[in-house]
């Protein structure tokens, strides 16, 4: 029995499902989840000392690669001064200044401790600001596990085939209107009917929780226009895309400015951090300036701020995102060529340093229906074949993959060699 199998068996005694986040259980791909003990650069090392090229990157934060020495040094320096104060620090002021200088929509920002907390708070703020109750989200998009957002959600909800989580009261769900992603006409029609009741539209500008689905041409622009017409707050959930698809996030990449944005993952450099912010007029409604309450014991935690500040400064160097995108493109082109050579229906998607892999004969992946029509069983086999070849992909057909600046020619060679063998075995 492997060390991972032993640990997983032990974990199930006191941890529900043996994991602390559902997708880690490998339920959607089968087999025993890997337990890791070390990560460095583009690699993770499991408890049985097998090394893998990592395309999960802790689900997005590790854009520099694992254990970047500058980030580790920043955290070590802060450790000498304490773990948490529950009081303001200079680091959180520096972080706020830096984020607002990078992201087009950010005039004010508040730090929280997770992406879920950020989206939950942004929606509460939008409701308080507008005096309206209803929200619009999109089918297959995941915005964290707060009650009102677990209606037809993506990510783990898709992985386990549970679009509406038990435990969400009907009274909460009735205020959540769910529309098809990339369908701007459905948005216009709905706002034309109930626009005066809608506080906000929340959207992943790139849907990263039904794998990776970029916006159709005109979709984000159409959302901006529709929100302006009906007095609705437009929220971009940039927990995945923020600082990854471009330094200023998807809003900079696509040239569409939301009213509020939410962030997580990269902003903490691997530490548990989230943030939300946007227009000063709206953000001034947050306590203690305004009546909308939001608070957090560990918000602005100095260790997390140290890691996040260092990460954001490092990714600000000229050419960083071009290099990240170029590697991702080379890797995806190589996968596509090998799938085509093996006669395997296969489609890839990309937004900067994030990507999607679909076993599908479709010309493109644009809608939730396109995603759900992909061959999940074939993905399961591919996942394990790649794992055997030393490549760790996201353990679900509905999760995006991530590259880092630490991925280079050697990692590309390992990845494509493993893929060539995997596609041949899938015939």
Curated annotation (Swiss-Prot):
GO molecular function: glutamate-1-semialdehyde 2,1-aminomutase activity; pyridoxal phosphate binding; transaminase activity
CC terms in the record's Gene Ontology section: cytoplasm
TM region(s), chain numbering: none
One GO BP: protoporphyrinogen IX biosynthetic process
Pfam families per UniProt: Aminotran_3
Entry keywords, A to Z: Cytoplasm, Isomerase, Porphyrin biosynthesis, Pyridoxal phosphate
Keyword Methyltransferase applies: no
InterPro entries membership: 4pyrrol_synth_GluAld_NH2Trfase (IPR004639), Aminotrans_3 (IPR005814), Aminotrans_3_PPA_site (IPR049704), PyrdxlP-dep_Trfase (IPR015424), PyrdxlP-dep_Trfase_major (IPR015421), PyrdxlP-dep_Trfase_small (IPR015422)
Catalytic activity: (S)-4-amino-5-oxopentanoate = 5-aminolevulinate
The EC number(s) this enzyme carries: 5.4.3.8
Compartment(s) of residence: Cytoplasm
CDD domains named in the record: OAT_like
Residues with N6-(pyridoxal phosphate)lysine modification: 265
Organism superkingdom: Bacteria
PROSITE patterns in UniProt: AA_TRANSFER_CLASS_3
Keyword Methyltransferase assigned: no
Metabolic or biological pathway: Porphyrin-containing compound metabolism; protoporphyrin-IX biosynthesis; 5-aminolevulinate from L-glutamyl-tRNA(Glu): step 2/2
Cofactor list: pyridoxal 5'-phosphate
HAMAP family in the cross-refs: HemL_aminotrans_3
Assembly notes: Homodimer.
NCBIfam families reported for this sequence: hemL, PRK00062.1
Similarity remark: Belongs to the class-III pyridoxal-phosphate-dependent aminotransferase family. HemL subfamily.
Protein name (database record): Glutamate-1-semialdehyde 2,1-aminomutase
């Amino acid at each position: 029995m492997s060390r991972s199998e032993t640990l997983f068996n032990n974990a199930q005694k006191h941890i529900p499902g043996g994991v602390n986040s559902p997708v880690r259980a490998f339920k959607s791909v089968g087999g025993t989840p890997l337990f890791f003990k070390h990560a460095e650069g583009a690699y993770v090392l499991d408890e049985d000392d097998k090394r893998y090229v990592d395309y999960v990157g802790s689900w997005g934060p590790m854009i520099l690669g694992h254990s970047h020495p500058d980030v580790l040094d920043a955290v070590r320096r802060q450790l000498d001064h304490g773990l948490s104060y529950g009081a303001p620090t200079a680091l959180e002021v520096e972080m706020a200044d830096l984020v607002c200088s990078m992201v087009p929509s950010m005039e004010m920002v508040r730090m929280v401790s997770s992406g879920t907390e950020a989206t939950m708070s942004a929606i509460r703020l939008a409701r308080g600001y507008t005096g309206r109750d209803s929200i619009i989200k999109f089918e297959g998009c995941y915005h964290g596990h707060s009650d009102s957002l677990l209606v037809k959600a993506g990510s783990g909800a898709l992985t386990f085939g549970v679009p509406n989580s038990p435990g969400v009261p009907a009274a909460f769900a009735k205020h959540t209107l769910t529309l098809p992603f990339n369908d701007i006409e459905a948005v216009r029609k709905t706002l034309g009917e109930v626009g005066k009741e809608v506080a906000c539209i929340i959207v992943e500008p790139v849907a990263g929780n039904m794998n990776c689905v970029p916006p159709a041409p005109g979709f984000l622009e159409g959302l901006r226009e529709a929100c302006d017409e009906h007095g609705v707050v437009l929220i971009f959930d940039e927990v995945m895309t923020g600082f990854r698809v471009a330094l200023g996030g998807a809003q900079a990449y696509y040239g569409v400015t939301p009213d509020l944005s939410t962030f997580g993952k990269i902003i903490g450099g691997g530490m548990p951090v989230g943030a939300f912010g946007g227009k000063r007029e709206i953000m001034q409604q947050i306590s203690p300036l305004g009546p909308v309450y939001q608070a957090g014991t560990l918000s602005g935690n100095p260790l997390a701020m140290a890691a996040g500040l260092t990460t954001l400064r490092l990714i600000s160097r000229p050419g960083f995102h071009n290099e990240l995108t170029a590697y991702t493109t080379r890797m995806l082109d190589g996968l596509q060529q090998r799938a085509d050579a093996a006669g395997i229906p296969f489609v890839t998607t990309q937004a900067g340093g994030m990507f999607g892999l679909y076993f599908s004969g479709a010309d493109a992946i644009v809608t939730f229906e396109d995603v759900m029509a992909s061959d999940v069983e074939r993905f399961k086999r591919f996942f394990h074949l790649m794992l055997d070849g030393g490549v760790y992909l996201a353990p679900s057909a509905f999760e995006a993959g991530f590259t880092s600046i630490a991925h280079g020619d050697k990692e590309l060679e390992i990845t494509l060699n493993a893929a060539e063998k995997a596609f041949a075995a899938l015939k």
